[in-house]
Amino acid sequence: MPYRMSRQAYAETYGPTVGDRIRLADTELFIQVEQDFTTYGDEVKFGGGKVIRDGMGQSPIANADGAVDLVITNALILDWWGIVKADIGIKDGKIFKIGKAGNPYIQDHVDIIIGPGTEALAGEGMILTAGGIDTHIHFICPQQIEVAIASGITTMIGGGTGPATGTNATTCTPGPWNMYRMLQAADAFPMNLGFLGKGNASQPQGLTEQIFAGAIGLKLHEDWGTTPATIDTCLSVADEYDVQVAIHTDTLNEAGFVEDTIAAFKNRAIHTYHTEGAGGGHAPDIIKVCGQANVLPSSTNPTRPYTVNTLDEHLDMLMVCHHLDPAIAEDVAFAESRIRRETIAAEDILHDLGAFSMIASDSQAMGRVGEVIIRTWQTSHKMKVQRGSLAGDGKADNLRAKRYVAKYTINPAITHGISQYVGSVEAGKLADLCLWRPGFFGVKPEIVIKGGMIAWSQMGDANASIPTPQPVHMRPMFGSFAGARNATSLTFVSQAALERDIPQQLGLRKSAVAVSGTRQLTKQEMKLNDALPHIEVDPETYEVRADGELLTCEPATVLPMAQRYFLF
């Protein structure tokens, strides 16, 4: 006889199912379940008197014969490709299957086998996303990594050597010796890491040696001199060795204007950092490049979203980050030229249109490493409130949610040639995953999984009789320590470095894998963020138009995902 449950009772027991809507934190964003891979009446759930017991939902099948190492039950997956309810099987540190878990001897349609060697993680009522990818890291201090993983970031790409003056301003790990030391340091962290070399050179040999040393890309930064000659040389070397180039262009227009920089690209793929320009770049019109097919544009989070406080905080940040002197008029003028309310407002809308493809932090160098995910969803919320639902979205905001989650997951992975390993919740990829309570979505993850093992988690008093007594906060778990962190995280290097056995020569303990497929990319590969509007910027008023339409919006006076969740 069938048993009927109300939707509320079902959701409280097994999590939401097809047609149910879920609010994301305290935003005005709602997502709706599109598909449910589980079977009504045959769901698996762990606990006393529940299903995952021997002879019931747990089979006698050994892991060697197909049972998974970890099953996440009844989770709601939010990814660029869909919003679905499913069980997730993890085996050998990778996502094995998204589907229906259980005991194939007594249950139908089981494609994730639970056995005596299977750990269980309750995903009922939880949202599951891929671990975030931050591709604009100034490696100024190692404590950034703790803050990042606690926020849901599992991959960090950028450059630096610590709190050196160059690193404070530019995301470069310059030269082989510095690159080797940073690769060795990477072994200490439960984080996938990749380092960019310095790309500013008008001759190739100094760039080539950095790629041979392990750089996964090169960074062109105006503080080192981003001229048309250095752009051309850097991209030519990148083309030869299949690594990405990231660029911070010439704010002062000393060596040319934005048109000269675009010409120097010669239609070659390039990742433009802080494409709006407050973080640096041709003033006032670097934002034009987001309409170029070969440009993969990102934002950094201090301008995300546009608020009443955005302009005021930027000037002081900029003076510190770029080693400027407030007593020198030219330095102040340089700083002020980068901060424009009109282009920052337009940036909000260009994200909502899918014309800006990625969001990153610019950590400790005008950006906040722990706020990439928060700022992304705050931008999405602001655009929902100010612009209404996207075409195709109705009572739920599925398209908008998928567009925005792609900005810090799959699109940065594609851009930097690592999407075969990370960036989405898909079978075969490293099991870098975040579980969120819906009320805390995007703000504070409940559990961060690295390579199939819990690395960080909300955890209460370790002396308590149960895990939940206060104070509860994010803490490192066993996946963050000793050999476990090396077995569950990756170090990204160039193919040229692998061919030269650099990881072995340095004694690296993490698996080192090569980036690939970076040089033939176009914006068309940016998932749900591939719009190519024609951008015009008025040089006097800084007004921005896309395909002739003025892009403007009001600054937010209040935001969700803010004081409600934090004491400080």
Curated annotation (Swiss-Prot):
Ranked from the top, the taxonomy reads: Bacteria, Bacillati, Cyanobacteriota, Cyanophyceae, Nostocales
One Pfam annotation reads Urease_alpha
Which segments cross the bilayer?
none
Question: Which NCBIfam families did the record assign?
Answer: PRK13206.1, PRK13207.1, urease_alph
Q: What class of enzyme is it?
A: hydrolase
Co-factor: note: Binds 2 nickel ions per subunit.
Q: Where does Ni(2+) 2 bind?
A: K219, H248, H274
Q: What are its E.C. numbers?
A: 3.5.1.5
Q: Which domain of life is it from?
A: Bacteria
Q: How does it assemble?
A: Heterotrimer of UreA (gamma), UreB (beta) and UreC (alpha) subunits. Three heterotrimers associate to form the active enzyme.
Reactions accelerated catalytically: urea + 2 H2O + H(+) = hydrogencarbonate + 2 NH4(+)
Instruction: Tell me where in or outside the cell this protein is found.
Output: Cytoplasm
List of catalytic residues? H322
- Listed name of the protein: Urease subunit alpha
Task: Domain (Urease): give its ranges.
Answer: 131-568
Q: Which InterPro entries match?
A: Amidohydro-rel (IPR006680), Metal-dep_hydrolase_composite (IPR011059), Metal_Hydrolase (IPR032466), Urease_alpha_N_dom (IPR011612), Urease_alpha_subunit (IPR050112), Urease_AS (IPR017950), Urease_asu (IPR005848), Urease_asu_c (IPR017951)
